A protein has these predicted regions:
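Edge beta-strand at a domain terminus
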Residues: 98, 103, 125-129, 133-151
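Cleaved targeting-peptide boundary
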Residues: 18-26
Length: 151
């Protein structure tokens, strides 16, 4: 009888646990083209809407009217969970796994990476805020972007 009660309890809890599992579609709020302009240049980031458990993104930094850095990224459903993967020229792809969090925020983490160890996106007053953070030489470091949506 105790075993039956345990099985019933586990079956009843299964939908709740499944509901807590993050999906790429939960990050649809990141979709669109975004920009941050500073005296040093412009950073543009674009995310395609989720399709088949995947999103594709591109970030481009412009200085003096010329692109100086272009980075491609994906967000995909992987066995480890929803994963942000950065593709930088001359480097192997770097995966960051989504940590549990609140709606409107996505914290991707890879503690084995040199820098950054976290890539963070959140909805904010200007539109989309992004941050990379981690440690370099034992010292906490970070960079922030405050993107406004492009028409």
């Amino acid at each position: 009888m105790k075993q039956l009660a345990l099985v019933v309890l586990m079956l009843a809890a299964t939908p709740a646990l499944a509901g807590e599992t993050a999906a790429v579609a939960d990050l649809a709020w990141m979709s669109g083209s975004w920009a941050q302009e500073t005296p040093g240049g412009t950073v543009r980031e674009t995310w395609m809407p989720p399709y088949d458990n995947a999103m594709a993104g591109m970030t481009q930094t412009h200085r003096q009217g010329r692109p100086v850095v272009t980075e491609f990224s994906t967000i995909t459903a992987e066995p480890a969970g929803v994963t942000f993967t950065a593709y930088l020229k001359g480097q192997p792809p770097t995966p960051f796994v989504l940590k549990p969090g609140k709606p409107g925020e996505a914290v991707f983490e890879n503690l084995t990476h040199d820098f950054p160890q976290r890539v963070i996106y959140r909805q904010c007053d200007v539109g989309l805020c992004a941050r990379i953070e981690g440690t370099i030489g034992g010292k906490a470091q970070g960079m922030d972007w405050r993107y406004r949506r492009l028409p």
